[in-house]
Curated annotation (Swiss-Prot):
Disruption phenotype: Disruption of the gene confers increased resistance to Zn(2+), associated with reduced accumulation of Zn(2+) when cells are exposed to concentrations of ZnSO(4) below the minimal inhibitory concentration (MIC). Mutant is approximately four-fold more tolerant to tellurite, and cell viability remains almost unchanged during prolonged exposure to the toxicant as compared with wild type. Belongs to the inorganic phosphate transporter (PiT) (TC 2.A.20) family. Pit subfamily. It holds the Pfam family PHO4. It catalyses: phosphate(in) + H(+)(in) = phosphate(out) + H(+)(out); arsenate(in) + H(+)(in) = arsenate(out) + H(+)(out). One of its GO terms (biological process) is phosphate ion transmembrane transport. This is Low-affinity inorganic phosphate transporter PitA. Interacts with the small protein MgtS, and this interaction contributes to an increase in intracellular Mg(2+) content. The gene is pitA. Residues 26-51, 115-123, 176-206, 254-381, 451-472 are cytoplasmic. Low-affinity inorganic phosphate transporter. Mediates proton-driven uptake of soluble neutral metal phosphate (MeHP04) complexes. It can use Mg(2+), Ca(2+), Co(2+) and Mn(2+). Activity impacts bacterial growth in low Mg(2+) conditions. Is also involved in Zn(2+) uptake, probably via formation of a ZnHPO4 complex. Can also transport arsenate. Involved in the uptake of tellurite. It is a multi-pass membrane protein. Residues 1-4, 73-93, 145-154, 228-232, 403-429, 494-499 are periplasmic. It is found in: Cell inner membrane.
């Protein structure tokens, strides 16, 4: 690992350490800000002692990051303006990363201090949008192009739909439990609050199987949170490393010969597909004429311009770099590796446009998505030590400051105390929906899903909601996005004044 940092001068080394500290601090805040959601219900239903619950959440957050894959990590990264992603080594790219992280840290710390379960995901996405808008305004480019609108809309869709799903499904579970699981005295215990059970049965803990279900569902929430939110931290660390130390991280320097061959085969197959469907490529790119591949033996200009009409030419360049004798990326110069990354990201954007075309069959869509995944496999990666560092930061953060937000979730959303059935329904809904989102690569808000699930159970159970708390949570939800947009955009503009 350390050899990848060899050759960095003092200034670059310090910049790298500072940037990594920023990302890991952001992830630690995410731990004590969002993971309160995983422990709130088990603590307030007395299924686990608070210290044990927090350690459990930290451990399963850690495992969630380690085992969760990278689909969400790069879904977030690709929301950034393409021109900044293609030029991550520039001072503008670094200013972007620092502004984005600082904005997210300021807002997350503020909402945590006041005990508001605001969304770290919303904050990060708002910060990314702020960067995109400021970059578009300063460079005079189209806001629509700068913001990667299709990606932004799909992520917004998941963030808006996920709390509604939480509300409806958790409420539905409570309805079913009330209808079919309250006929006998033994079954009806699941609908008691801890205080009611102590008064009625003289016992402080939930019934055995109810307690097991509460603990398992809390483990599910913690694991799902690590798999979804932890990946966002991994994506940010990779952005930093590509920007500050591109020589070691612009592509996966540890890629095996097999992985490089897989990338090369994908490039050949993408080119073959586009050569067979030139009309589709023209339609997707909006170009009257595609730039053809150069004649054999002709020299190509050194500078590559990313434009969809250049796709065939771009694929030809990639083939020229990744010849069959390249079994390790060490054989390519830094310039070649950087250009290879730029071209692959450019081709990837074109593939995304073609996949969305109405004339593309479902089989072709699957084929193109698979080829895109194979092509990007050696640039969309994360070393194990990065995954471990993010997992540790998230786990440590969980154990530090969980109490403020957990109190809001456990005590202040409903007018009455939380019953065992409500806690279990909210957690099961959150664990399943966040887990599915991580599997499909959609970033969702753990906070929104669990808060809305708790609210759904309270409404269906007839307990009602505390207006003051719900208003505060809704205000935090509404203002998180514009606040993050303004903060990151302002910080980015300010930082560029000094470059």
């Amino acid at each position: 690992m350390l050899h990848l940092f060899a050759g960095l001068d003092l200034h670059t080394g310090l910049l790298l350490l500072l940037a990594l500290a920023f990302v890991l601090f952001y992830e630690a805040i995410n731990g004590f800000h969002d993971t309160a959601n995983a422990v709130a219900t088990v603590i307030y239903t007395r299924a686990m002692r608070s210290q044990l619950a927090v350690v459990m959440a930290a451990v399963f957050n850690f495992l969630g990051v380690l085992l969760g894959g990278l689909s969400v990590a790069y879904a977030i990264v690709h929301m950034l303006p393409t021109d900044l992603l293609l030029n991550m080594g520039s001072s503008h790219g670094l200013a972007m990363v620092f502004s984005m992280l600082l904005a997210a840290i300021i807002w997350n710390l503020g909402t945590w201090y006041f005990g508001l379960p605001a969304s770290s995901s919303h904050t990060l996405i708002g910060a990314i949008i702020g960067i995109g808008l400021t970059n578009a305004l300063m460079t005079g480019t189209s806001v629509v192009d700068a913001l990667n609108i299709p990606k932004v809309l799909s992520i917004f869709g998941s963030l808006i739909v996920s709390p509604i799903v939480g509300l409806v499904f958790a409420g539905g579970l409570i309805f079913l439990l009330r209808r079919y699981w309250s006929g006998t005295k033994k079954r009806a215990r699941i609908h008691l609050t801890p205080a009611e059970r102590e008064k009625k049965d003289g016992k402080k803990k939930p019934p055995f199987w109810t307690r097991i279900a509460l603990i398992l569902s809390a483990i599910g929430v913690a694991f799902s949170h690590g798999a979804n939110d932890g990946q966002k931290g991994i994506g940010l660390v990779m952005l930093v490393l590509i920007g500050v130390a591109p020589a070691g991280f612009v592509v996966n320097m540890n890629a095996t010969g097999y992985e490089i061959t897989r990338t090369r085969d994908a490039i050949n197959n993408v080119e073959a597909y586009f050569e067979q469907h030139p009309a589709l490529l023209k339609q997707a790119t909006g170009a009257d004429q595609l730039v053809p591949a150069p004649e054999a033996g002709a020299t190509q200009p050194a500078e590559f311009h990313c434009h969809p009409s250049n796709t065939i030419n771009a694929l030809n360049r990639l083939k020229g770099m990744l010849t069959t004798d390249v079994e390790s990326y060490d054989k390519l110069s830094l310039d070649q590796r950087s250009q290879m990354r730029r071209i692959m990201l450019c081709v990837s954007d074109t593939i995304d446009k073609v996949v969305k075309m109405p004339g593309v069959s479902a089989d072709d869509q699957r084929l193109l998505k698979k080829l895109k995944s194979d092509m990007l496999s050696t640039i969309e990666y994360a070393p194990v030590w990065i995954i471990m560092a993010v997992a540790l930061a998230l786990g440590i953060g969980t154990m530090i400051g969980w109490r403020r937000v957990a109190t809001t979730i456990g005590e202040k959303i409903g007018k009455k105390g939380m019953t065992y059935a409500q806690g279990m329904s909210a957690q099961m809904t959150a664990a399943v929906s966040i887990g599915l989102a991580s599997y499909t690569g959609m970033p969702v808000s753990t906070t929104h899903v669990l808060s809305s699930s708790v609210a759904g159970t309270m409404v269906v159970d007839g307990g009602g909601l505390q207006r003051k708390t719900v208003t505060s949570i809704l205000m935090a939800w509404v203002f998180t996005l514009p606040a993050a947009v303004l903060l990151s955009g302002g910080l980015y503009w300010l930082s560029l004044q000094f470059l």
